[in-house]
Amino acid sequence: MSANGSSVAQLLWQPPVCRSWKPDVEGAVYHLANCFLLMGFMAGSGVYGCFYLFGILGPGYLCCVLWGWFDACGLDIVLWNVLLTVACLLQLAQLVYRVRVNTLPEEFNLLYRTLCLPLQVPLQVYKEIVHCCHEQVLTLATEQTYAVEGETPINRLSLLLSGRVRVSQDGQFLHYIFPYQFMDSPEWESLHPSEEGTFQVTLTAETECSYISWPRKNLYLLLNRERYISRLFSALLGYDISEKLYTLNDKLFAKFGLRFDIRLPSLYHVLSPSASDGEPESEKDDEEALEAAVSPAQARPICIVPTPPCSAPPATTNFPVPLPRARMPRMPRPDSGNLASRRPLQNSSQVMSRSQAPLAPIHTPEL
């Protein structure tokens, strides 16, 4: 035991005895190999760090092979460095294969950066969502209909990637659908998985459009299997439907100067054109009900008389209850400027500032 300890101590504390040192240094290939190795071991993490690591170590070990073959003349040096060079090349090939497999088409890559990356959706989860739509991008020509009211069945969920889609009912324009908005989110939420239904609106492409579509059955299976994806779609669909409701509310404000409760079930009839002499009595009754709701607010301005500071107010004095302040109008989208001009918006805001209008008509026409 003592002999082994003494031999280890000699190896550690006594320098190796060299019979003779080389009078000259190694060749340029040897120093080039060490430079490659030094730069390679300074690589970072991640996929690109691995590309850098094995891309630099491979040439470094190859230079060691050349040095061992031409200068050192050692078979063991050549064999070990050949093995290390092959290992680096295999790692590079495996990295290239993984990158090619995980690469998405340009449309889906842009969709991920726009819609899912701000929500910190993992890329693997996004790939499952894309795989559910078979990674297909569908197109619509100008004035081509995506759905016809009363005819097209609700059997899919689609997301617009580019272009603009017009939504109408009975020929009456309702709102637009812009890129990265769902095209049929209200229809999707209106049905249970076991129910069948048809579109109540017509969707027409105003420009050349591209979109992706999930089959209804496949998407329901994915949502039932993956709870995270189900919550993600619930949040996205809820936000999309609220945006559509606010778009309708903005159009009402541009037309009447009023902001109605978005929970009303008959906004479509309020959006219909003004009643004329030749229209049916039902539409005239709708207009009269709307005027009856607006006229009291405009005929009774709010006036508060200040009370002298010395006299105490009587016990039975009823102070006027302030009405809720109307919300400021939402800014229209860049492509939907023709929904309302700036002049009606300004006039409507002045009317709202002078007299507070009710949130909704008193008598709402039924569908």
Swiss-Prot record:
Species name for this entry?
Answer: Mus musculus (Mouse)
Expressed in which tissues: Expressed in the developing and adult heart, with high expression levels in the sinus and atrioventricular nodes. Also expressed in the bladder and skeletal muscle.
Q: What is this protein called?
A: Popeye domain-containing protein 2
Q: Where are the transmembrane segments?
A: 36-56, 77-97
GO CC annotations, alphabetized: membrane; sarcolemma
What residue spans carry the Polar residues bias annotation?
344-356
Carries keyword Cell division? no
Choose any GO biological process term that the UniProt entry carries and state it: regulation of membrane potential
Q: Which residues carry this modification: Phosphothreonine?
A: 364
GO MF, any single term: cAMP binding
Spell out where the chain is glycosylated: 4, 347
Q: Which InterPro entries does its entry note?
A: cNMP-bd_dom_sf, POPDC1-3, POPDC1-3_dom, RmlC-like_jellyroll
Task: Please give the knockout or disruption phenotype noted for this protein.
Answer: Knockout mice are deficient to adapt heart rate to physiological stress, this deficiency develops in older mice. They show severe sinus node dysfunction with long pauses and intercurrent periods of normal synus rhythm. The sinus node structure is abnormal with a loss of pacemaker tissue from the inferior part of the sinus node and a compact structure of the superior sinus node.
Q: What compartments host this protein?
A: Membrane; Cell membrane, Sarcolemma
Q: Where is this region: Disordered?
A: 273-292, 312-367
Keywords, ordered alphabetically = cAMP, cAMP-binding, Cell membrane, Glycoprotein, Membrane, Nucleotide-binding, Phosphoprotein, Transmembrane, Transmembrane helix
Which topology term describes how it sits in the membrane? Multi-pass membrane protein
Acidic residues bias: start-end ranges: 278-290
In the record, the note on similarity to other proteins reads:
Belongs to the popeye family.
Its biological function? Important for the maintenance of cardiac function. Plays a regulatory function in heart rate dynamics mediated, at least in part, through cAMP-binding and, probably, by increasing cell surface expression of the potassium channel KCNK2 and enhancing current density.
